[in-house]
Amino acid sequence: MKKDIHPKAVPTKIIYQGKVVMETLSTRPEIHVDVWSGVHPFWTGEERFVDTEGRVDKFNKRFGDSYRNKKK
């Protein structure tokens, strides 16, 4: 077996809205998340509207009609 081929695992802080919500091991020292199980509606049982743009909406907002006109 080869030695030293695996990445080094370090203590990692999972950060949600500027607060540390969990600590684990990973190859990164910090991971910033938008949603985690402590606030996700599926796990909390509350119903709420998550206001996020989809990939297509972000693309259209960024490039708009200019991309569609170039394809034709």
From Swiss-Prot:
SUPFAM superfamilies: L28p-like (SSF143800)
One MF term in the entry's GO annotations: rRNA binding
Record's protein name: Large ribosomal subunit protein bL31
Single biological process term from Gene Ontology: translation
Keyword Lipid metabolism found: no
Gene label: rpmE
Disulphide bridges: none
Keyword terms of this UniProt record: Ribonucleoprotein, Ribosomal protein, RNA-binding, rRNA-binding
Annotated organism of origin: Deinococcus deserti (strain DSM 17065 / CIP 109153 / LMG 22923 / VCD115)
Record keyword Ribonucleoprotein present: yes
Function, as annotated: Binds the 23S rRNA.
InterPro entries reported for this sequence: Ribosomal_bL28/bL31-like_sf (IPR034704), Ribosomal_bL31 (IPR002150), Ribosomal_bL31_A (IPR027491), Ribosomal_bL31_sf (IPR042105)
